[in-house]
Regions:
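Residue-level preference for the first positions of well-ordered beta-strands
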Residues: 2-6, 28-30, 72-74
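The conserved Walker
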Residues: 10-11
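Short, charged, surface-exposed secondary-structure boundary motifs
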Residues: 41-42, 103-112, 132-134
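Conserved lysine of the Walker
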Residues: 15
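NTP-dependent small-molecule kinase module
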Residues: 5, 21-25, 91-94, 115-143
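Short loop/helix-cap segments at secondary-structure boundaries that form the rim of catalytic
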Residues: 86-91, 106-107, 112-118
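Glycine-rich phosphate-binding loop used to anchor ATP phosphates in small-molecule kinases
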Residues: 48-103
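Conserved substrate/cofactor phosphate-moiety recognition/catalytic segment
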Residues: 19-62
Length: 143
């Protein structure tokens, strides 16, 4: 099972809530939230595509350091385009697409967001809570 878990989707779709629910079930797991990384390590970046790619590269580097030490890592960020996903190396991650909303709260992100072609789990708005989704998501990690 892959140790790097990417939780991606539009802003406001529930990525961080799901990340916390998975973390609570898995216990000793490192989480990287893109908003926190952007407000500290990458506070100089804008939201241009070039800087979004740099943000994805940073998220990849951080998560790769965690998994190199034999830990699981959750990375919670929008990852809106094929270019940002390639920069993150998403095919070497367990990808969870949180697809619970049609539009996010930022128009510029809505305009560039491309639904992923590859994902392991697609979280939809079917009435289940983040905790219920998390229970289903973590099962293969321990089965």
């Amino acid at each position: 099972m892959k140790r790097k878990i990417l939780i991606m989707g539009l802003p406001g779709s529930g990525k961080t809530t799901l990340s916390k629910a998975i973390r609570d079930l898995m216990g000793n797991i490192i989480t990287w939230n893109a908003d926190e990384v952007r407000s500290t390590i990458n506070k100089h970046l804008t939201f241009s595509l070039e800087d979004r790619i740099k943000q994805a590269e940073t998220m990849k580097w951080l998560s790769d350091k965690v998994i190199a030490n034999n830990h699981y890592c959750i990375v919670d960020f929008i990852c809106p385009t094929p270019e940002t996903r390639a920069a993150f190396d998403y095919k070497n991650a367990y990808v969870i697409w949180v697809d619970r909303i049609d539009t996010g709260r930022f128009d510029d992100t809505n305009q560039i967001f491309v639904p992923p072609k590859y994902y392991d789990v697609r979280v939809i708005d079917d009435g289940r809570s983040a905790e219920m989704w998390a229970a289903d998501i973590v099962e293969p990690f321990y089965g």
